[in-house]
Amino acid sequence: MLVKTFGAAVQGINATIVTIEVNVSQGIRFLHVGLPDNAVKESHERIASALEFCGFKLPRKQIVINMAPADIRKEGSAYDLSLAIGILAGGETLQFEELDKYVIMGELSLDGGLQPIKGVLPIAIKAREEGFKGFILPKQNAREAAVVNNLDVYGVENIKEVIDFFNGDSTLEPTIVNTRDEFFSNINLSDIDFSDVKGQENVKRALEVAAAGGHNIIMVGPPGAGKSMLAKRIPSILPPLSLQEALETTKIHSVAGNIDNNTSLISQRPFRSPHHTISDVALVGGGAFPQPGEISLAHNGVLFLDELPEFKRTVLEVMRQPLEDRKICISRAKFSIEYPASFMLVASMNPCPCGYYNHPDRDCVCGPGIVQKYLSRISGPLLDRIDIHIEIIPVPFEKMAEMRESELSELVRNRVIKARNIQEQRFKDIDGVYCNAQMTSKQQRTFAPTDKASSELLKNAMQRLNLSARAYDRIIKVARTIADLDDSENIQSNHIAEAINYRNLDREGWAG
C-alpha cells in the first residue's frame, strides 16, 4: 500500500516541503531512496525500537521509502517521526486519510520519545505557505513554531500520541502563542545601561553616531579602559527590532538550534562575542553540512570582536566581503546557500602588545616598530571597512567619584531612533538600504552632498592623512549620520570635522 507523509528540508534559512512516499508490499527488503544521508538511512533501527517500545511492530513486508524532490539532500534524524507514521499507515496500522493535511517532523528516541529538532520556524512558515492545516513536532519546539499564524501547531512528547491522534483515539491540543504580545513584552528587557559607564563621553558620542547610522566601529585603548563594557551596552541604544527583523533573526537562530524551549521569538538585537581562537568556518559559516556562522547569528545586531589583532589573519580577511555585501554565500560542488549577515561590527584592541602605548600614567615597554607591527596585523582593506576609529583614554580612579550621573541608554536610544527615522524616509524607495552605512557611492552623491567649505576641509584631510577612496566614502557616510543626529538637512563643515576625527588609525604618527 502506498501512502504519503510530509516533512521539510531546510536550506539556508528557508525550507522546502519534502514528500515522503512509503510503499509497503510483499517482500522482505527495506529500501530508502531520494538522497538521504546516513542519519536518515539509519532511521530504520530507531523506528523499529521506538514502535516496539510503544506496543507496535514494523510490517513484516518490503518497505520502500522515497523522499522527493530527490535533488535536495535530506540530513539528520528529524524525519524519523514522519517516516514512522508513513510506515504504520502503509502497513494499515494507522488511518491515513488526514495525513496529507499535516507536516510531521521529529527525532525518535529508542523508547518512542521525541527529541527537539533544528529549523522549526522556517518549516512552519513554509507549511503555512503551502496550505497545510497543521504541524506536528516535538513539544520542546512547539512554542517556536506557534509564532506562525493560521497554522495549528501540535507539540507531542512521543510517537504514541501521534498514532492515537490519527486513529481518532485521542485529540491534541494546539500550542497557541500571541506573536505580537510575545514580541512587545520582551522588546525592551535589558539589565545593562550606558549610565553604568562613568566618563568616556567622547567614546559614548562615537558609539551613538555608530548606532544611529549602523556604522562599524573600532575602539583602541589600554586594558581596563572600558572597551568591553561599552561594547556590551551598544544593543541598549540601538533601535528595537521590528517584528519582521525579529522573525528573520529567529529563523537564523532556529536553523542553528539556538532557540530554547521557552523562547518563541527573539525580541532583542543579538550580541555575539566570539573568542579570538575562532576558526574561519565558525565565524562566517559553512562546514560539510553548512550552518550559519557568528556573522549570521549577529544579523540585525552586534558582532563584537575583542582584541582584534589576536584573531587569525585568515579569519579577519574572510569577513571583508560579508561586511560589504551584508550576506554570505557558501558554495559547494552541487549547491550554494546564502545566509544574511547585516550586522554592526564593533571591535576593540590594545594599542600595542603590552597595552600601554599613549597611556597617561603607564610607560609602554614595546620597542621601536613593535607598535606599528602590532597594528599591521589588521589589514588596510579591513580597516577601511570600519567607519569609526576611536581612541579610549582610561578615566583616573579618583575622578570617577566626582563625575555626575551618566546619560541613560533610553535617552541616547531616542536620539538614535529619531536619526534612523530620518534615514528610513530618505531611503524609502530603495530596496535593501535602511541606514547611512548601507549607502553606495552613487547614493552618497544624491543623499549626502557637501558644500564648498566641507569639500575643502575633506580634501585637505585626504591629502594629509593619505586616506583611501573607501575611507573618503566612510567619512561622508558618518558625516551624514552626524547631520541627522543634529536634525540638519545638509552636511556642514563641523559634521565633516567630527567624522574626520573618527579616523584615528589613519593618522600619520599615531603609532610612532
Regions found by a protein language model. Give the residues of each.
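Basic, amphipathic alpha-helical bundle interface domains used for macromolecular binding and assembly
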Residues: 39-44, 59, 66-76, 289-290, ...
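Walker B catalytic acidic pair
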Residues: 300, 306-307, 318
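Peripheral, non-AAA+ core regions of ATP-driven protein-machinery
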Residues: 1-218, 222-228, 331, 471-472, ...
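P-loop NTPase nucleotide-binding/switch module
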Residues: 170-209, 213, 240-295
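Residues immediately C-terminal
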Residues: 110, 303-304, 310-311
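Short beta-strand elements
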Residues: 18-24, 283, 387-390
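Walker A/P-loop
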Residues: 219-260, 325
